[in-house]
Amino acid sequence: MTGSTIAPTTDYRNTTATGLTSALNLPQVHAFVNDWASLDMWWFSIALMFVCLIIMWLICCLKRRRARPPIYRPIIVLNPHNEKIHRLDGLKPCSLLLQYD
């Protein structure tokens, strides 16, 4: 053993420039972070954000539409001859339970 020193395997100059502070040397992560800016991939992040916003907006609209009661106004015609309520909306007629004085 002659006084040799072991050099560190991590080059901190490469990792601190990208914000990575790991003690391990990960060349694939380093290349990905640097290539993200060099490949002009900034538009992908913005597009992904807009896609998520549109999906969230559609979910909110569908939940509100499902929560509202349906607007339903039946058309009812009273027919005094057979004491039944005739509905013009296609549903079954129901018997009239009112007593006449």
Curated annotation (Swiss-Prot):
As for PTM, the annotation reads: Glycosylated by host. Palmitoylated at cytoplasmic tail.
Q: Which residues lie on this side of the membrane: Cytoplasmic?
A: 63-101
Query: What name goes with this protein?
Result: Adenovirus death protein
Which family does the similarity line name? Answer: Belongs to the adenoviridae ADP family.
Q: Which residues cross the membrane?
A: 41-62
Localization (cell):
Host nucleus membrane; Host endoplasmic reticulum membrane; Host Golgi apparatus membrane
The chain's Extracellular topological domains, given as residue ranges, are: 1-40
Question: Which pairs are disulfide-linked?
Answer: none
Q: Name one Pfam family in it.
A: Hum_adeno_E3A
State the organism of origin.
Human adenovirus C serotype 2 (HAdV-2)
Q: How does it assemble?
A: May interact with host MAD2L2/MAD2B.
Q: Which GO terms describe its cellular component?
A: host cell endoplasmic reticulum membrane; host cell Golgi membrane; host cell nuclear membrane; membrane
